[in-house]
């Protein structure tokens, strides 16, 4: 069972209690923590769309600490980030691996950050399937198509050429924050919030 801290605020109508994530959502901060799967992705997409409806001009901050997860779930978050009008800044704290690193790279150019001890990992998608030979062939084609799509997304957001992205994603490729900056996944390694304010 996961315990979620509650925050109590004084209002003109008395006290109001929020879970910590709802309170942070009021500040336009979205957390992506843990494995990326369908239910979590639906919640993140809903938060992005809600914040756009509330103020389409104001920046949204996405904090990422994730080992990755289901590709289609991650792509639903990615597509929504690109679809909505507000700029989405991304910040890695802890780790951004697999789909987590793709979402980190997908932030607004110039607004993609990582803390100094963050770990970023990119790799090609994996999949296992059992069944009839024809079904295995269908799924093999699908995973190759997904691999190609993910490569194209990394090319778009890192500025690297396709052969370089393909070579770097052939196996699990772990990076420190500085290396992720050199590769183009993030724009800046930050130690303090002031570093973000100075870069904007």
UniProtKB/Swiss-Prot annotation:
Gene designation: clpP
GO biological process, one term: protein quality control for misfolded or incompletely synthesized proteins
Catalytic activity: Hydrolysis of proteins to small peptides in the presence of ATP and magnesium. alpha-casein is the usual test substrate. In the absence of ATP, only oligopeptides shorter than five residues are hydrolyzed (such as succinyl-Leu-Tyr-|-NHMec, and Leu-Tyr-Leu-|-Tyr-Trp, in which cleavage of the -Tyr-|-Leu- and -Tyr-|-Trp bonds also occurs)
Enzyme type, top EC level: hydrolase
Function (record text): Cleaves peptides in various proteins in a process that requires ATP hydrolysis. Has a chymotrypsin-like activity. Plays a major role in the degradation of misfolded proteins.
EC number: 3.4.21.92
Keyword Cytoplasm: yes
Protein family membership: Belongs to the peptidase S14 family.
Protein name: ATP-dependent Clp protease proteolytic subunit
A molecular function GO annotation: ATPase binding
Active site as annotated: 98 (nucleophile), 123
GO cellular component, one term: endopeptidase Clp complex
Keyword terms of this UniProt record: Cytoplasm, Hydrolase, Protease, Serine protease
Subunit structure: Fourteen ClpP subunits assemble into 2 heptameric rings which stack back to back to give a disk-like structure with a central cavity, resembling the structure of eukaryotic proteasomes.
Annotated localization: Cytoplasm
Superkingdom classification of source: Bacteria
Taxonomy of the source species: Bacteria, Pseudomonadati, Pseudomonadota, Alphaproteobacteria, Rickettsiales
């Amino acid at each position: 069972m996961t315990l979620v801290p509650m925050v109590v605020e004084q209002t003109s109508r008395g006290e109001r209690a929020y879970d910590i994530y709802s309170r942070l959502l009021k500040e336009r901060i979205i957390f992506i923590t843990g494995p990326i799967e369908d239910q979590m992705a639906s919640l993140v997409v809903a938060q992005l769309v809600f914040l756009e409806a509330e103020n389409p001009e104001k920046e949204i901050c996405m904090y990422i600490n994730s080992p990755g997860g289901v590709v289609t779930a991650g792509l639903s978050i990615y597509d929504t980030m690109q679809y909505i009008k507000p700029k989405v800044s991304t910040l890695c704290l802890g780790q951004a691996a697999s789909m987590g690193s793709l979402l980190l790279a997908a932030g607004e150019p110039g607004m993609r950050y990582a803390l100094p001890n963050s770990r970023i990992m990119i790799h090609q998608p994996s999949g296992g399937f059992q069944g009839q030979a024809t079904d295995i062939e269908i799924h093999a084609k699908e995973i190759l198509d997904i691999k190609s799509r993910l490569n194209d997304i990394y090319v778009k957001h890192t500025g690297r050429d396709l052969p370089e992205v393909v070579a770097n994603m052939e196996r699990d490729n772990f990076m420190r924050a500085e290396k992720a900056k050199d590769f183009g996944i993030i724009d800046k390694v930050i130690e303090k919030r002031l570093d973000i304010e100075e870069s904007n």
